Structures are given as C-alpha cells and as structure tokens.
Amino acid sequence: MTLTVRVISPDKTVWDAEADEVILPSTTGQLGILSGHAPLLTALDTGVLRVRTSKSQNWQAIALLGGFAEVEEDEVTILVNGGERGDTINLEEARTAYSQAQTKLNQVPAGDRQAQIQANQAFKRARARFQAAGGLV
C-alpha cells in the first residue's frame, strides 16, 4: 500500500503524489511515516522533507519552512509556510546562501537576542534549501 502525500504552501501545491515512505522534519526530530501509520497531527520545523516514491526507489527532497502535518488513513497532508522541491533549487546559489547565512549567524553580537533569532531562522532556511538541493547530507 502507498501513501498519498500533499505538500501545500500558501501560494502553490509543492508536491501531490503517491509515496511509499515519508520522513518529516518535526519539531522534536525526524519522523518516519509508512502506510498504516496511526493518525497524527504534528508541528514541523524548518528542514527537509524526504519522500520515497513508488515509481522510483530514490528519495525526493523538499525544503520546508515550518508548518504542520496530518496523517490520516494513508494520507499525509502537509501545510507549510513555504516549500521548494530540491530538484528545482540551484545548488551553487543554495551553497552561497548557506555560507553567507552561517557567516552572519557567527557575527551576531552575543547580547542581541532579536538579531540572533533572525540570523538563526535565516540559517535554518538556507541549510534546508542547501540540503534539499543535495549539498548537505
């Protein structure tokens, strides 16, 4: 049996296809979903969603910018603030953005809490895009 997986952002459907397995970036760690999984509602962190399709045993990567996932009767519905398929991300641009975000994060003054939070969020977004594009494992 397979899962029906939908990834929906405010402006587009990022993914809508059958899959054998899904790995979600939940706020408490990675969460694997197979057919027959118990019903579930979970918050998602900024990170990489991995989907193994029935047609190909390869994993597809999708960068997610946080959201929620619901699992119900072999249907996985993922509502995200933003999402981008790894195969549409330019690897070199993602590598540059990741490096720049890492540098900015390291340069934030220790006492500037708001700047630290913003730089950390930018770093997590850049890392997710770079990972989804195949730059980091």
Curated annotation (Swiss-Prot):
> What protein does this entry describe?
ATP synthase epsilon chain
> Which Gene3D superfamilies does UniProt cross-reference here?
F0F1 ATP synthase delta/epsilon subunit, N-terminal, Helix hairpin bin
**Which of UniProt's keywords are assigned here?**
ATP synthesis, CF(1), Hydrogen ion transport, Ion transport, Membrane, Thylakoid, Transport
SUPFAM superfamilies found in the cross-reference section: Epsilon subunit of F1F0-ATP synthase N-terminal domain (SSF51344)
Which membrane topology term applies here?
Peripheral membrane protein
Q: Which family does it belong to?
A: Belongs to the ATPase epsilon chain family.
Question: Looking at the UniProt record for this protein, which Gene Ontology cellular component terms does it annotate, in alphabetical order?
Answer: plasma membrane-derived thylakoid membrane; proton-transporting ATP synthase complex
The record's function comment reads: Produces ATP from ADP in the presence of a proton gradient across the membrane.
Subcellular localization: Cellular thylakoid membrane
List the Gene Ontology MF annotations in alphabetical order: ATP binding; proton-transporting ATP synthase activity, rotational mechanism
Q: Which HAMAP family does this UniProt record tie to the protein?
A: ATP_synth_epsil_bac
Q: What does the annotation say about its assembly with partners? A: F-type ATPases have 2 components, CF(1) - the catalytic core - and CF(0) - the membrane proton channel. CF(1) has five subunits: alpha(3), beta(3), gamma(1), delta(1), epsilon(1). CF(0) has three main subunits: a, b and c.
